Amino acid sequence: MAGWQSYVDNLMCDGCCQEAAIVGYCDAKYVWAATAGGVFQSITPAEIDVIIGKDREGFFTNGLTLGGKKCSVIRDSLYVDSDCTMDIRTKSQGGEPTYNVAVGRAGRVLVFVMGKEGVHGGGLNKKAYSMAKYLRDSGF
């Protein structure tokens, strides 16, 4: 879906993100657009199911994966109507840096952003929330 790439480009334009993606979570459960070569490009339907699933506690204990990358859930407000976001942090494997990730939920898509090293999760959360709200208000 080439039209969705412009949304990813918009999320990336201020330089604080290393990756962004728009991912369908309803009937078209796959990555619609993502930063080329990134982890988000490989997000699977099973990983989407964990994020949107009914079990809102298990991932706090067990973590989750995004494109095969292990992550910890910091805060889950994905189904809180006034918020619709989730804050995640990648886990270090082999000593590499960890990164903040924010997810925003619109009506049919999830917005993913991953910050560069040292980028605070609060700014990423606001970015994911704003894009998800825009898409929700636009019928997505």
From Swiss-Prot:
InterPro entries: PFN (IPR048278), PFN_euk (IPR005455), PFN_sf (IPR036140), Profilin1/2/3_vertebrate (IPR005454), Profilin_CS (IPR027310)
GO biological process assignments: modification of postsynaptic actin cytoskeleton; modulation of chemical synaptic transmission; negative regulation of actin filament polymerization; negative regulation of epithelial cell migration; negative regulation of ruffle assembly; positive regulation of actin filament bundle assembly; positive regulation of actin filament polymerization; positive regulation of stress fiber assembly
GO MF annotation list: actin binding; actin monomer binding; ATP hydrolysis activity; phosphatidylinositol-4,5-bisphosphate binding
Regions that span the bilayer: none
Principal subcellular localization: cytoplasm
GO cellular component entries: cytoplasm; cytoskeleton; glutamatergic synapse; postsynapse; presynapse; Schaffer collateral - CA1 synapse
Disulfide bonds: none
SMART domains per the UniProt record, alphabetical: PROF (SM00392)
Modified-residue entries (N-acetylalanine), positions: A2
CDD domains (UniProt xref): PROF
Subcellular locations according to the entry: Cytoplasm, Cytoskeleton
Pfam families in UniProt: Profilin
Cytoplasm keyword on record: yes
Alphabetized UniProt keyword annotations: Acetylation, Actin-binding, Cytoplasm, Cytoskeleton
PANTHER family: PROFILIN (PTHR13936), PROFILIN-2 (PTHR13936:SF15)
The protein's assembly and partners: Occurs in many kinds of cells as a complex with monomeric actin in a 1:1 ratio. Interacts with PFN2. Interacts with ACTMAP (via N-terminus); the interaction may facilitate efficient cleavage of the acetylated N-terminus of immature actin by ACTMAP.
Function: Binds to actin and affects the structure of the cytoskeleton. At high concentrations, profilin prevents the polymerization of actin, whereas it enhances it at low concentrations. By binding to PIP2, it inhibits the formation of IP3 and DG.
Family according to the record: Belongs to the profilin family.
Full protein name: Profilin-2
Organism: Rattus norvegicus (Rat)
Lineage of producing organism: Eukaryota, Metazoa, Chordata, Craniata, Vertebrata
Gene responsible for this protein: Pfn2
